[in-house]
Amino acid sequence: MMKVAAAVCIQNGKVLLASRPENKPPSGWEFPGGKLEPGETPQQAAKRELLEELNWEVLPLDIIYQLKTPKITLYFVRVIPAGNSTPAPCEGQQIKWETLSPEFPCGMLENDRNFWKFISLSTSR
């Protein structure tokens, strides 16, 4: 089973999303991240992937949601920026800060939709 870490950064009511690189279908918006390497925790993978993909130093905190399907375990890891760093995509993808609301962002990938619903409901209370 494939294990994937997705980084969740919420700042000022907005959530960081990244587009999938053109060479990695399906296309759409997702929480940035990637596959865990052998022996790596989801937090370590989230930190490594954001550095590789977005040249962004973050501090990984806790796993706030986990989604299991027959093919994948997806860990959503809360992260905060390290210092004054900002994301700068370096693998051809785009990023955007999406306002947190009950509506899914247009083009959001299916596996991320359940988590989007979870965080939008959790933060609206």
Regions found by a protein language model. Give the residues of each.
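Conserved N-terminal beta-strand and adjoining loop/helix that marks the start
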Residues: 1-16
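Short secondary-structure boundary/capping segments
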Residues: 7-8, 21, 66-68, 86-89, ...
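Residues that recognize and position ribonucleotide moieties
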Residues: 8, 29, 96
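Structural detector for helix-capping/boundary residues
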Residues: 13, 34, 48, 93, ...
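Nucleotide phosphate-binding site architecture
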Residues: 16, 37, 104
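A conserved beta-turn-beta hairpin within the catalytic core of GNAT-like acetyltransferases
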Residues: 24-28
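The catalytic Nudix box helix
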Residues: 31-64
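Active-site-adjacent beta-strand/loop module that shapes the phosphate/pyrophosphate-binding cleft
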Residues: 59, 65-101, 112-122
